[in-house]
């Protein structure tokens, strides 16, 4: 029967309107056992979070300046709180890192200007403000970016705030217990038998404080990598494929910023940066991320 065959053939063909509707609605998350809310949370569906709003460029700049001011104010308050005890911190750091400083008169700090002590105290206070200001900067950055972040990304960013402070303290401790003793032992051993070293307060503390602040920032590398991967800005494979470029960048930055002309400090700093970079990638590889 020709009419019966035509009906059967028509029944076997999908309704074009229904096909278009299925394509427009995308995969059935509920049927697959998923939850639409979870998919939105992960950023798998939708164009962006509901809280994301367009703002004029001037409004963005104004908010960014305001949040930067908060970071500077917090750092300044911490610096003012530390300044009264800065001389005690100077004596502690000096006696800790200059070999024989307490017993050898020549190893005591030398002042070659009337304001060197005050300037050094200000630098010590500024270092304390910088270390405390790092997590504040992370938090203010989170508040600035919050409207454009998915809930999952917000959780990651909030968890980064205390992590940033912990990593900064670990970096300062690493500089205090590992980097600085090695550098000053090298300096004193290098000049023994050739000249008597008279350590100037300004130059010596510039090296100490710069390396401490530098290490506080360097130890943020694992945090930056983890955040970038968790927020889908990059992948571990992408970073591993370009590791030599990162190594070269680390070496360049270490030799450019380090105040040590002998090359000892830049090598230690660059080795630390590369170790943190590779260690983070190894941890991600081990956990399957």
Language-model features: where?
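Membrane topogenic/interface segments and analogous intrinsically disordered interaction regions
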Residues: 1-289
């Amino acid at each position: 029967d020709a009419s019966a065959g035509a009906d059967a053939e028509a029944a076997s063909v999908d309704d074009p309107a229904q096909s278009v509707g299925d394509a427009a609605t995308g995969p059935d998350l509920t049927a697959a056992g998923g939850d639409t809310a979870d998919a939105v949370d992960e950023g798998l569906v939708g164009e962006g979070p509901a809280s994301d709003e367009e703002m004029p460029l001037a409004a963005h700049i104004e908010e960014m300046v305001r949040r930067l001011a908060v970071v500077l104010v917090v750092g300044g308050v911490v610096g003012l709180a530390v300044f009264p005890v800065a001389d005690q911190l100077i004596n502690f750091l000096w006696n800790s890192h200059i070999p024989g400083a307490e017993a050898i008169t020549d190893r005591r700090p030398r002042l070659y200007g009337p304001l060197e002590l005050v300037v050094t105290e200000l630098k010590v206070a500024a270092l304390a403000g910088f270390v405390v200001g790092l997590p504040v900067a992370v938090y203010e950055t989170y508040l600035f970016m919050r409207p454009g972040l998915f809930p999952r990304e917000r959780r990651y960013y909030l968890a980064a705030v205390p992590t940033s402070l912990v990593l900064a303290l670990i970096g300062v401790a690493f500089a205090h217990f590992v980097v600085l003793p090695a550098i000053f032992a090298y300096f004193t051993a290098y000049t023994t038998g050739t000249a008597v070293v008279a350590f100037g307060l300004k130059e010596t503390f510039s090296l100490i404080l710069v390396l401490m602040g530098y290490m506080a920032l360097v130890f943020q590398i694992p945090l930056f990598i983890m955040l970038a991967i968790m927020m889908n800005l990059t992948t571990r494979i992408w970073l591993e494929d370009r590791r030599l470029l990162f190594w070269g960048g680390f070496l360049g930055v270490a030799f450019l910023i380090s105040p040590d002309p002998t090359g000892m400090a830049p090598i230690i700093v660059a080795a630390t940066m590369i170790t943190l970079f590779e260690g983070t990638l190894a941890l991600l590889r081990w956990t399957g991320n």
